[in-house]
Swiss-Prot record:
Family per similarity comment: Belongs to the coronaviruses ns2a protein family.
Pfam families reported for this sequence: Corona_NS2A
Gene3D superfamilies according to UniProt: Cyclic phosphodiesterase
InterPro entries reported for this sequence: Coronavirus_NS2A, NS2A-like
Protein name per UniProt: Non-structural protein 2a
Length: 278
């Protein structure tokens, strides 16, 4: 089956950088150098990394939203990872930094989004970069400008871990910018989204064990199909009706999301175990 590419994209997956103060301070230093040198360019006011281009419609937003959450849930953090920015240079009409350390994240996002039936990534090879400014045609033709840009130095690293302010967002091309950020359709913190405190006691067993039999006991008779696979499918996509399952359980329980994703129970029968008295 042929792969569909977002060669005429209308959205992208955004990794905003404005919240990383140390990076932004150095980033703006580069922009100041350009302006001080008199290079005619339009400064980027919302520093970011475009992790994947998308060709999607509003009805696809929910699928891409869920794919982003699944990528975050499946991340193996360890001690975290580093994003490295260096080598200011001209790419097309833009002055950009090379970005290294997010290649695996790019691949995961593309694969998970495609698994949802949505179009992601372009036919040309993805190159991680961060735009500093866009040159005018006149500025691009001036050799002194090109030589100055090629002589610029930059080297900065950001460490991303579960406590970092890192986010993944769906942004429409041409979206407005405010205070260093794009207007977003969806924005998710990349930290580990474990939450063990259920909103009510009634949901505690469902969120803690993700056992289909427990779920059936908590729901009204006939709410779930008798076939287990059909039941998991209904739970996974129950948010279509904006039910309390999605609002209070699916969004809050890592285990429940993974159980729904795998169509399998995580409880191993422990919910029925009893404590023996001495």
């Amino acid at each position: 089956m042929a792969v569909a590419y977002a060669d005429k994209p209308n959205h992208f997956i955004n990794f905003p950088l404005t919240q990383f103060e140390g990076f932004v301070l150095n980033y703006k230093g580069l922009q100041f150098q350009l302006l001080d040198e008199g290079v005619d360019c339009k400064i980027q006011t919302a520093p970011h990394i475009s992790l994947a281009m998308l060709d999607i419609q509003p009805e696809d937003y929910r699928s891409v939203d869920v794919a982003i959450q699944e990528v975050i849930d499946d991340m193996h953090w360890g001690e975290g990872f580093q994003i490295k920015f260096d080598n200011p240079h001209i790419l097309g009409r833009c002055i950009v930094l090379d970005v290294k350390g997010v290649e695996e994240l790019h691949d995961d996002l593309v694969n998970y989004i495609r698994d949802k039936g949505c179009v992601a990534d372009q036919s040309r090879k993805w190159i991680g970069h961060c735009t500093i400014a866009q040159l005018t045609n006149a500025a691009l033709s001036i050799k002194e400008n090109v030589d100055f840009i090629n002589s610029m130095q930059f080297n900065y690293k950001i460490t991303i871990n579960p406590s970092s302010p890192a986010r993944l967002e769906i942004v429409k091309l041409g979206a407005e910018k405010k205070d260093g950020f794009y207007e977003t359709i969806v924005s998710h913190w990349m930290g580990i989204r474990f939450e063990y405190n259920p909103p009510t006691d009634k949901l505690a067993m469902i969120m803690g064990y993700c056992c289909l039999e427990v779920v059936r006991k908590e729901l009204e008779e006939g709410d779930l199909p008798e076939n287990d696979d059909d039941a998991w499918f209904k739970l996974s996509y129950h948010y279509e009706n904006n039910s309390w399952f999605f609002r209070h359980v699916y969004r809050k329980s890592f285990y429940f999301r993974k159980s729904c994703q795998n169509l399998d129970c995580n409880c191993l029968g422990f919910y029925e175990s009893s404590v023996e008295e001495d």
